[in-house]
Design a protein with these regions (language model features):
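Charged, solvent-exposed interaction patches on well-folded alpha/beta domains
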Residues: 1-13, 21-39, 44-49, 53, ...
């Protein structure tokens, strides 16, 4: 009669709020772990290290259940926005990546852009701008900070705003205040807004785009 101490591991029980993780992910991550060993011979530390290599895994709890079950509890990062199109950020500015075919576009997350190492700065800037705009009826679609610390945002209405390096909140507020009067006076002449440049002490400039992609610029005080 075989002693239970030597029974091979026969079951992995994987639980947690899993949006991106599949059972196959866990099995593949553990390919270097000798699953044909007994439960008591399994090294929990090594198992955690293997699974942690999955970019979207935030935390893992592994427990042994007698006589031959390994219980794995997974905590995933929760994205609040996309980062440079191909990655994601959580609320703490942690960058992670999920297989593209598992990303559900119905969440319509905003997209943030920035140089390497700037994720937390851009996320902080996004939150500041979001607080300004959240009660106005506009929606932030993307926020970008370039290597010169100059800010650009695109609204869900496909309006691009150049905010520049400083006073981005005041400049955004200027646009919000002027927009109802500005849009009211736009004639339906086949033109659409290319972008609005708010990098002025007063007023802003509007770049128009026509069907032939010709752009001209009009200053509005």
């Amino acid at each position: 009669m075989q002693h239970t101490h030597y029974l091979k591991l026969s079951k992995l029980l994987i639980t947690g709020k899993l949006c991106y993780t599949t059972n196959d992910d866990i099995y593949h991550a553990m390919c270097n772990v000798h699953l044909n060993k007994s439960l008591m011979e399994q090294d929990i530390r090594v198992i955690c290290q293997q699974i942690s290599q999955l970019s979207w895994i935030k935390g893992i709890s592994v427990r042994k259940q007698w006589p031959n079950v390994l219980k794995i509890y997974i905590i995933e990062y929760e994205p609040i926005c996309y980062w440079n199109d191909v990655q994601m950020l959580d609320k703490d500015g942690v960058i992670f990546q999920v297989p593209i075919d598992r990303i559900n576009d119905k969440y319509c997350l905003p997209i943030l852009y920035g140089p390497e190492g700037s994720a937390l700065d851009v996320l902080t800037g996004y939150r500041v701008l979001y607080d300004v705009i959240k009660s106005t009826g506009f929606t932030l679609r993307s926020v970008k900070m370039n290597h010169r610390y100059s800010w650009q945002i695109i609204l869900k209405e496909n309006i691009k705003l150049e905010l520049g390096r400083k006073n981005k909140v005041e400049r955004l507020q200027r646009f919000i205040k002027a927009y109802p009067f500005f849009i009211k006076n736009i004639q339906n002449d086949g033109r659409c807004i290319n972008y609005i440049d708010l990098r002025y002490d007063y007023g802003f400039a509007v770049s128009w785009m026509t069907c032939s992609n010709y752009s001209d610029c009009e200053n509005i005080e």
